[in-house]
Amino acid sequence: MVAGVFLGAILCAAAAPFPEKPITVIVPFAAGGGSDTFVRIFLKAIREHDLAPQPFVVKNIGGAGGTIGSRAALKAAPDGYTILCLHDGMYTAQHYGNADWGPADFTPIAATGRSGVVVAVVENSPYKDLAELMADAVARPYQLVYGTNLGAPNHYSALFLQHGKPGAKFRFTQTGGGAKRLAQLKGGHVDVTGFSVAEYEPFKEAGIRALAVLSEEREAALPDLPTAREQEVDAIHGLMQFWWAPKGTPPDRVAYLEKLLRRVMETSTVQARLAQLHVDPEFHVGDDLQDVIQERSRELEGLQLEKPAALPPVHWLVLGFVGLCAVWVWREDKPA
C-alpha cells in the first residue's frame, strides 16, 4: 500500500503542469547592460502577449565576467525553474581559464539572435582602414594596444582579428565593458577596440570611427562599412545569445521552454526591438543548436592565447615599498 501511495505521488508530480510557479532567468551581469536589456525584451513579450501561465523574473548576478552568475545557474536545481541567458561568454570563460565549466555542463535550450562586431579607432587615428591597422600590427608586434575585457567575447573578437592576419600581434589590455572601452579609446589609452553593432550605433557620434565589421557580409545597419575579409583579413566573429538550463533538467520542460522562446521570437515586440538593436533574429534549437554550439567551440581551438604575466598581490607590493622606505630612512639617520 505504501508503495502504491509513493508511486501515485511520483505519477502526480510527473503529470503536474509546468510551470506552476515563477521561472527565474539568471542574467550574469549588472542591470542595465546589454545582456540584461536583451532578456527583458523577451520577458516583456511574454507578459504582453500572455505566452506563459507564470511570470518570468530576472535575477541579476553580476561579477567576474559573468562567471559568478553562470556558476549559480550551474548549481541550481535542474527542475526548469531556474535558467540562464548567457552569450558566447559561456565558451570564452572556460577557454581562457576563468571558469572550469562550459557548454557541456548545461542543457542548451535555444540560441536567439546574433550581433555583429565592429573594430573601431578614435576619429583622428592615423589608420584609415583595417588593412593599415593590421599592417602596422605586423610591422610593430605588441605595440598597438587593443582594449578588451580579458576572457570575454570582445577579447575573443580581437583574437580572431589577430589570427586573421599572419604575423599580427596586439597588446591586449583590460578595459571592461563598452562604455569603459569608449572612454579608454577617446582618452588615447588604447589604439583600437571592438564594439557590438548595437554598442557602436550610439557611440559613433562620440568621436570614434569604425574600420571594419567582423561579419560574413556587411551589416544592414552599416552598409558602407566593409568586412574584414574585404580588407584581406580572414576574421569572422559575432555574438550569439544562448539560453541554458542546468544539466539534468527534464526534457519535457526543456521542450516547453524551447517552444516558448520560439513563440516569443515571433512576436512583433521582439522583432521590432531586435531590429532597433541591430540584432539578427537567428533562432536555433535541437540538432541545429547542437551544431552551432559545437562549431563555436571548435572555432576557439585554433586561437593562440598569450596571457599577461600575473603581478604579485597588491599587499605584498605595498609591504615591499614600505620596507624599502624604512631601510632608506634608517640609512639616512645612521650616524656616520
Predicted regions and their residues:
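An extracytoplasmic/periplasmic, membrane-proximal ligand-sensing/linker region
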Residues: 20-22, 252-325
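Bacterial N-terminal signal peptides
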Residues: 1-10
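Sec/Tat signal peptide C-region and signal peptidase I cleavage site
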Residues: 11-15
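C-terminal membrane-anchoring or membrane-association module
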Residues: 323-336
